């Protein structure tokens, strides 16, 4: 997929204008924990471009916030395929429910698990 920089910028801006409350909470929590946060980071996996809800560049970790529709069978399959593609590009993926995204201790625990599992 070859998207122009202008198109990618427009898509990012549109996504950032629609940030959910849970995503805003997760961003605040990641920042409070001392991580640099990039919102709606474009990630190219083969022929597909995804926009990560939250990207923590120091950990090469993507944090995805899963609302209620992410728990349907069809969406879970799509999310698993997306996570696998992202993982194959060398990124780590943390998935948080809307509820967990608001809890700094749960955000911290998930990120700590990734750090422990994938130490450099």
Kindly give the residue locations of the regions a language model identified.
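Nucleic-acid endo/exonuclease domains
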Residues: 1-120
């Amino acid at each position: 997929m070859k998207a122009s920089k202008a198109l990618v910028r427009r898509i990012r801006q549109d996504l950032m204008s629609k940030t959910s409350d849970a995503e805003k909470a997760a961003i605040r929590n990641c920042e409070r924990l001392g991580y640099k946060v990039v919102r709606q980071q474009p990630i190219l996996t083969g022929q597909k471009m995804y926009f990560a809800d939250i990207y923590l560049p120091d950990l090469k970790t993507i944090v995805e916030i899963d609302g209620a529709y992410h728990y349907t069978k069809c969406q879970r399959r799509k999310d698993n395929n997306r996570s696998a593609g992202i993982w194959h590009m060398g990124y780590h993926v943390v998935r948080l429910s809307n509820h967990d995204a608001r809890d700094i201790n749960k955000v911290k625990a998930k990120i700590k698990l990734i750090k422990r599992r994938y130490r450099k």
